[in-house]
């Protein structure tokens, strides 16, 4: 008799769980995996554009203006001498010399010849190369031209920053100082990579060296803004954990003098149903600007809305490490390579039905990303990555209640791609188009799925809508830039988004009649008012053009405000 009430309570709990499950089965219940994915969308960094041309020196001969056509003579041979008056091989100049040798030439023609030789070497990576027609007596039709390719002279450093002199020396030794000559691509790479170092501004200055044909390099480095912070509010959260979110963060550069950077980000939703903390520390580790970093992330959540009765809550811990290398740095092309490892511990509970799930995920990701000034006034961005993962899955659910495809251990592979283009148009207009997507080799756990909805997806649908194993997104946007106030810019835009995907890679366990594919699309308009380094206010509204998500809102209104210090 005393046992009956206890069994009655258990039976009631099971019954409650069944009823709740039936009522919400059509909805995607957020968990630690999907909520982490939503935050990863928020953490996407702005894309870096190539800088454009750094050095554009043309070889203007000092003789051209003073030489007239004048007396001509037959040119039989041209001797090219280096700065030590040693004759150099001229095979690479044959296509230039053939236009002069064996013909009647004047001093003006010889000046043009020297100019062409200078231009040839400058276009072939010798930044300050100069061909000079020295004073000489021309005998038997032989003319001597002095070729100064631009040898590396003295490299001096004026460092008024927290960046270590030793690091700057190592970086110069792998670029400009690695060659006998001042090579354009190496000098550009040095200038670009040192200006990529957070917390510093760098400038380069070339001057004539002490010896003939030498060029000295002066490196000037000053501190930029080493400490920065921000506070932001937005309504981009999940409706089951709180739409409104408050975030704050800080960043400190050059703590150890090796271009290191420490970043801390904190976020909480309204009523604190979602809390997240993330820390990232990285430092340059060699003279090739390779960066090593470590990350840690903590998330805690509790669901409301339709899932409140389930008493759903959970938390996750993520630890990671990465290597980032600037593989290619030129004025018009950037390519970076990144390898990262992450270890995740995910825990989810539905306390009303006594269900607890634990997952451990180890993943290794290798990828590239970059940008290219391929078209005038336009920049193309791209990225490719492959993730290899291992999942260990535990659940307290009885076997008869678990999904048919549940596996305690599994391996998976995920492929991601992104391609976008930004084109500046006349009259302060611009057009953006982009496509990104994901492929998988099997059905994925929620932390690896692609989210089609949200501000980074189809903007007419809420954050977290349509979580798919494989999917593709197309976004187009037409913008107009208008300077306002003293330093602010008002950007107005019209956009269209389209997304499609498969909820599950392997659909063999789905019941008949359950649709495994989804297509979303929306149109909208937005306004953005910002002052770089000070504040940004973004407002947009989007309307779905589909009816493929149950209980979807008729429109989405997105708002974010950020203040930087």
From Swiss-Prot:
Stretches that traverse the bilayer: none
GO molecular function, a single term: protein transmembrane transporter activity
Keywords: Cell outer membrane, Ion transport, Membrane, Porin, Protein transport, Signal, Transmembrane, Transmembrane beta strand, Transport
One GO-annotated biological process of the protein: monoatomic ion transport
Signal peptide: 1-26
Domain POTRA: 73-150
Subcellular compartments: Cell outer membrane
Superkingdom, natural source: Bacteria
Stored Pfam families: POTRA_2 (PF08479), ShlB (PF03865)
GO CC annotations on file: cell outer membrane; pore complex; type V protein secretion system complex
Function recorded in the entry: Likely functions in the release of soluble HxuA from the cell.
Family to which this protein belongs: Belongs to the TPS (TC 1.B.20) family.
Domain description: Probably a beta-barrel protein.
Name this protein carries in UniProt: Heme/hemopexin transporter protein HuxB
